[in-house]
Swiss-Prot record:
<protein>
    <recommendedName>
        <fullName>Immune-associated nucleotide-binding protein 10</fullName>
    </recommendedName>
</protein>
<feature type="region of interest" description="G5">
    <location>
        <begin position="170"/>
        <end position="172"/>
    </location>
</feature>
<feature type="region of interest" description="G2">
    <location>
        <begin position="39"/>
        <end position="43"/>
    </location>
</feature>
<dbReference type="GO" id="GO:0030246">
    <property type="term" value="F:carbohydrate binding"/>
</dbReference>
<feature type="region of interest" description="G4">
    <location>
        <begin position="131"/>
        <end position="134"/>
    </location>
</feature>
<feature type="binding site">
    <location>
        <position position="171"/>
    </location>
    <ligand>
        <name>GTP</name>
    </ligand>
</feature>
<feature type="coiled-coil region">
    <location>
        <begin position="173"/>
        <end position="308"/>
    </location>
</feature>
<comment type="similarity">
    <text>Belongs to the TRAFAC class TrmE-Era-EngA-EngB-Septin-like GTPase superfamily. AIG1/Toc34/Toc159-like paraseptin GTPase family. IAN subfamily.</text>
</comment>
<feature type="binding site">
    <location>
        <begin position="12"/>
        <end position="20"/>
    </location>
    <ligand>
        <name>GTP</name>
    </ligand>
</feature>
<feature type="binding site">
    <location>
        <position position="33"/>
    </location>
    <ligand>
        <name>GTP</name>
    </ligand>
</feature>
<keyword id="KW-0342">GTP-binding</keyword>
<dbReference type="Pfam" id="PF14299">
    <property type="entry name" value="PP2"/>
</dbReference>
<dbReference type="InterPro" id="IPR045058">
    <property type="entry name" value="GIMA/IAN/Toc"/>
</dbReference>
<feature type="region of interest" description="G1">
    <location>
        <begin position="12"/>
        <end position="19"/>
    </location>
</feature>
<dbReference type="GO" id="GO:0005525">
    <property type="term" value="F:GTP binding"/>
</dbReference>
<dbReference type="Pfam" id="PF04548">
    <property type="entry name" value="AIG1"/>
</dbReference>
<feature type="region of interest" description="G3">
    <location>
        <begin position="61"/>
        <end position="64"/>
    </location>
</feature>
Length: 463
């Protein structure tokens, strides 16, 4: 019976000790390892070792995933080589980090690049290996002490996604017993990966994903070239059309200048003729007529003008209580550089909103209607009872106009946005002008209702 083979892939940023970790696993120096900024590993390399009382391991070292001096296409090609080397599939991926310093943004980029190349499922096969165990030992620290000093959010997430699998390595140790124990701990994590993934190595999904990404990249390059050629052709055609349009506009402009000059000359002659024929009496009549027209126009404008009473100027029961009502800035008034405040009902049993208006300032002999401007949100609740809408004259003399009252089912307005609800009408005849009041209320049902926004009251002419 042949010994089981485990394919282990090393990934990480240059300088974190990938190659040294590989040599520790193999028990002999096979991978080149130097302490320098530029990566030593430029291509994927694989070496094999038989672990005593354990499996045969194939250790595959890869280029630094975030090395700026290694082109992206080269990294993709080397990943394909890595898969070719791992014939039986990848059994574990060692994400090599250094415990000698703080985790940097480059480490986060390494994890992101790893997921982009292999897919997010690769974290199911990941084991986080921290090198620099000798430094922690000199400082009399453990790996847990290192984490307590501060663990970046992204690393916490990575450890959680890979089942918390982590191990500390001292690649400089000369203690053979310690070396064997390190490798034993790591292989235990590899076995845990197998248990969590059902013993299925990461291979077929990788081949298919990389092939699809390569094909998609080629198709994207073809689309870019095709789009560029099409854009250049469209640009050339557009430039030609613009040139022709420019010539056409220049010709029309010259023609229009001639017509304008002729029209100005004709207008000048006609004006001279009109000035000579006008008489003083006719001019006076024209001025009187103009004044009359302006006066009538101003009356119409006054009659057509709408009046808006904002929510802040209304009497809203319990509006002083933040438990029942909330004041919210809504629209921005550009002319006054202010915000329009609206009142949002959070919940109240006694619902009463009222106000008043002096009609002596309104246009005479005009028919007006009074409308509450409200918004019943989708989440409005407990509006089963009808709401009373009232319009009445305040301090009216005996025999004057009476109170107008109507009931409104507010449920029909839920979710309809801003709506106007009719409260009543009045006509500004000489005998009816004065102070009028209006009210929207419901105080009998005992329901605790909410979800209503009051913007104000609109008074406008009825055509």
């Amino acid at each position: 019976m042949s010994e089981p083979i485990k394919n282990i892939v090393l990934v990480g940023r240059t300088g974190n000790g990938k190659s040294s970790t590989g040599n520790t696993l193999l028990g002999t120096k096979q991978f080149k390892s130097k302490n320098q900024a530029k990566g030593v590993t430029m291509i994927c390399e694989m070496y094999r070792a038989a672990i005593q009382d354990g499996p045969i391991i194939n250790v595959i070292d890869t280029p630094g995933l975030c090395d700026s001096f290694v082109p992206g296409d080269d990294i993709s090609n080397e990943i394909i080589n890595c898969l070719t080397m791992a014939e039986e599939g990848i059994h574990a991926v060692l994400l090599v980090l250094s415990a000698r310093g703080r985790i940097s943004k480059e480490e986060e980029s390494t994890v992101n690049t790893l997921q982009c190349i292999f897919g997010s499922q690769i974290l199911d096969y990941c084991i986080v290996v921290f090198t620099g165990g000798d430094d922690l030992e000199e400082d009399d620290q453990t790996l847990d002490d290192y984490f307590r000093a501060g663990c970046p959010e992204f690393l916490t997430k990575v450890l959680r996604l890979c089942g918390g699998r982590k191990v500390l390595f001292d690649n400089k140790s000369k203690d053979e017993k310690k070396k064997v124990e390190q490798v034993k701990q790591l292989l235990a994590r590899v076995e845990n990966v197998g248990e969590q993934t059902g013993g299925i190595p990461y291979t077929y999904q990788l081949h298919r994903k990389i092939k699809e990404e390569n094909d998609e990249r080629l198709r994207e390059e073809e689309r870019v070239i095709e789009s560029k050629n099409r854009a250049e052709a469209e640009l050339a055609e557009m430039q030609q059309n613009l040139l022709m349009e420019k010539e056409k506009l220049q010709m029309e402009e010259a023609k229009n200048k001639q017509l304008i000059a002729q029209a100005e000359a004709n207008e000048k002659l006609m004006e001279q003729e009109r000035a000579k024929n006008r008489a003083e009496t006719e001019l006076a009549a024209v001025m009187v007529e103009k004044l009359q027209m302006e006066e009538e126009k101003n009356k119409q404008l006054i009659a057509q003008a709408n009046r808006m009473i904002c929510a802040r100027d209304l009497n809203i029961e319990w509006s002083h209580s933040e438990e029942h009502w909330k004041w919210v800035n809504l629209d921005h008034n550009i002319s006054s550089n202010t915000f329009v405040e609206v009142a949002e009902l959070l919940g109240v049993y006694w619902f009463d909103v009222s106000g008043s208006l002096d009609t002596t300032e309104m246009a005479p002999w005009t028919h007006y209607e009074v409308l509450f401007v409200v918004n019943l949100k989708d989440s409005a609740f407990k509006w089963n009872a009808a709401v009373k809408m009232n319009l009445f004259y305040i301090n009216s003399r005996p025999g004057g106009p009476g109170t107008q009252e109507r009931a409104v089912d507010m449920r029909q307005h839920i979710g309809k946005g801003w709506v106007t609800i009719h409260a009543g009408e009045f006509i500004t005849t000489p005998e009816n002008v004065g102070l009028i009041g209006f009210r929207m209320s419901e105080v009998d049902s005992g329901d605790n209702r909410g979800g209503l926004i009051v913007k104000g009251v609109l008074i406008r002419p009825i055509n």
